[in-house]
């Protein structure tokens, strides 16, 4: 939702007796823990420019000099092509674990990033990778023929 400029509303309220159901309390605790570890990737962010390819594993949010990659699947690595920015640093937002990012430029001058994820990491519904870049704005290269 945030990655497209929206807000996420929680439909949580009391039952007829004025008690908040236990499942709702658990959901609030999970969201609170996620936000404690990864709130930087949500608060004050903007939607990323439209990525030129469809991805079914996650979404992007941005702040100046930062791209946040939200992964909703357990993956050994992330491969992104048509990356317009020069990466400086790459890490898991939840615990600061530094990640290996390999930048590649093809003979057609298309830039790609391959980010390698650790096998053991904090289990989360949304694993957030932060890539700090040299440029203030995040941009993706256009697809060329």
Located regions from the model:
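Mature catalytic domains of secreted/periplasmic carbohydrate-active enzymes
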Residues: 1-145
